[in-house]
Amino acid sequence: MPIDYQRDDQRRLITVTLTDPFTLEELLRQIDRQWAEHTWEYAVLYDTRAVSSATPPVELQQLVEHTLVVGAGQPRGPIGVAIPPRPEVLRRGLQLAELAGPRREIEILLNEAQVNAWLTRHAPRRA
């Protein structure tokens, strides 16, 4: 399955794991799902470490625009994007954060330690 969507209500966390091949439309459906499930303020970790190529800039723009339309200006939870440590993917990750603008909290995560630190800050395990 190219996109795996896991929801953890206790941690207020959604984990979206992408693998090849997936389409932009499939990814946009995950955003629609989050809105429909009333989990817009949950932390979302997009794990793209198993994806072989960087998302084209035009698709990044469509992703950001779709998110803004679906969210209708409502505050969104923090977004973490785990990427493979490759220069072209890092460039696209930074481009995504820039396109999203200052109203969106997007962190690009390069390694497991950064992913774990992000999860600790934004989706701690509760007793």
Model-predicted regions and their roles:
Residues 1-127:
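Amphipathic, Lys/Arg-enriched alpha-helical "gate/interface" segment within cytosolic domains
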